[in-house]
Amino acid sequence: LPLRAERMRPFYRWLRRHNRRVFLGAFGMDRYWVKAGLDCQTFRYSDFNLGSQVRQRADNDFWIAEWLHGEKGRLNTYIAQDCDGIVAGLYEYDASYRKEFADKLRFIPFPIDVRRAPLIADFDKTDFPAERPVRFFVGVQRDRSSYKGTDVMLRALRRLEAERPDEVQVVKVENVPFEEYKKAMLSCDVLLDQLYSYTPAMNALQAMAQGLVVVSGGEPESYEILGCTDIHPIVNVLPNEADVYEQLRALVDHKARLPQLSHESRLYIERYHDHLKVAQAYLDFWQSIGK
């Protein structure tokens, strides 16, 4: 509901009274995500910390004020303590809630309708043309570029493009309608997504369903929580420009691997994020809570 947190509490209480089971979704910015990032221990890096150092940013100050010291955070705590179950959609959100709510927490991956995801133009090719440049896609949201690390990733990519202009092609879109964004993405091989994440989020997951190779968070924890041991299609990058550059350079140096990574990306989504499998997991969790 587009209401202030203090006005939403009565709505939650009404829902609680009129439903046998109530669940909280841990899918994005909330008190426990902010708290975990700021403790500088739960994550090696996140939107809020790099190692033992808190990232000093105006937008983080805003989130801290809202979620740690404001009514949003108090409402979040109240619902988390009162609800019957909590669903975490990414490893990061699971880790954020697990310390306090392990007994009612369930990790269920984000859903992707794989069948409706259009494939990139070269998905069916088994060999990458030796003479063709690798096409990198970067979507920029001006107000979130620095927060999500797009600025750092783009600098590394531009450096590689300047050094190897015949082997690297950059497709950059900025603040465009979603349909135009999707069309531009389909002409590319590799998507650059978030720098400070352990896992691919919705934008990257959708791209993987379409056969793009994703440069984002692919830490071991993200595979372990899924039980994924045989494929590792995500190009994991550490949150610094030097590592991003090295990973991008390796993709260009070994571009013959791109078709395999493309197919593994699609397989990853089919296995772990298929919307019907996810729906069944929600139903199973709901039914497991007896009331």
Predicted feature locations:
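Acidic donor-binding loop of glycosyltransferase active sites
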Residues: 186-199, 212
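A short, active-site helix/loop in glycosyltransferases that binds the activated sugar's phosphate group
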Residues: 33-34, 63-107, 155
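Membrane-proximal helix-turn-helix segments that form the acceptor-binding/catalytic region
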Residues: 9-21, 47-86
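Conserved donor-binding/catalytic core segment of Leloir-type glycosyltransferases
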Residues: 108-120, 124-148, 154
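Acceptor-binding helix/loop patch of EC 2.4 sugar-transfer enzymes
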Residues: 24-70, 143, 219, 226-227
